[in-house]
């Protein structure tokens, strides 16, 4: 081994081990709400979303249907939807949103011009109240859903 190579190896920083993945065990809820402007295009969007199986890969699933079963206060337009998707953690919700398949193939189906006027927000799951322990299931995920293999796009600022 040459002297220069030996010197370089002595002064080179040691490779840092990859960071351990955060546990994906704090469920979040992605809420999509707003008015549907083009139902046919939204149906095509929903079909593409289902066919991609991205929710299945990331542990996402619907916990509500988009239309209310009752309105207790206020006026809800007939084209208004509120759809909630549960993910096992924020990282998986982000992996869904920033996935190449969603951003480049599925999302454009409802944009330009917009097929709906929606907001998409994510909320943490509230802790189970002590008085509810033993009365309801905690709703935890029993399988791991890794976001590591899902191709991503750069998140928008």
Spans of model-derived segments:
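Surface-exposed, polar helix/loop patches in the mature regions of secreted/periplasmic/lumenal proteins
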Residues: 82-131
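Bacterial N-terminal signal peptides
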Residues: 1-10
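Exposed alpha-helical structural elements
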Residues: 4, 41-44, 101, 105
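Short S/T/G/P-rich N-terminal loop/turn motif that feeds into the first structured element of a domain
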Residues: 9-81, 88-92, 123-157
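A generic structural signal for short, non-catalytic loop/turn and secondary-structure boundary residues
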Residues: 2, 25, 113-115
């Amino acid at each position: 081994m040459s002297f220069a190579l030996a010197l370089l190896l002595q002064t080179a920083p040691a490779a840092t081990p990859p960071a351990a993945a955060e546990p994906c065990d704090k469920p979040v809820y992605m809420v999509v709400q707003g008015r549907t402007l083009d139902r046919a295009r939204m149906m095509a969007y929903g079909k593409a979303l289902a066919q991609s199986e991205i929710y299945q890969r990331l542990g996402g699933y619907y916990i509500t249907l988009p239309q209310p079963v009752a309105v207790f206060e206020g006026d809800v337009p007939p084209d208004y939807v509120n759809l909630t998707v549960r993910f096992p953690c924020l990282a998986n919700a982000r992996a869904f949103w920033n996935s190449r398949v969603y951003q480049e193939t599925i999302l454009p189906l409802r944009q330009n011009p917009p097929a709906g006027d929606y907001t998409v927000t994510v909320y943490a799951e509230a802790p189970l109240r002590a008085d509810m322990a033993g009365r309801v299931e905690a709703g935890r995920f029993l399988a791991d859903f890794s976001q590591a293999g899902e191709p991503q796009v750069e998140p928008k600022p």
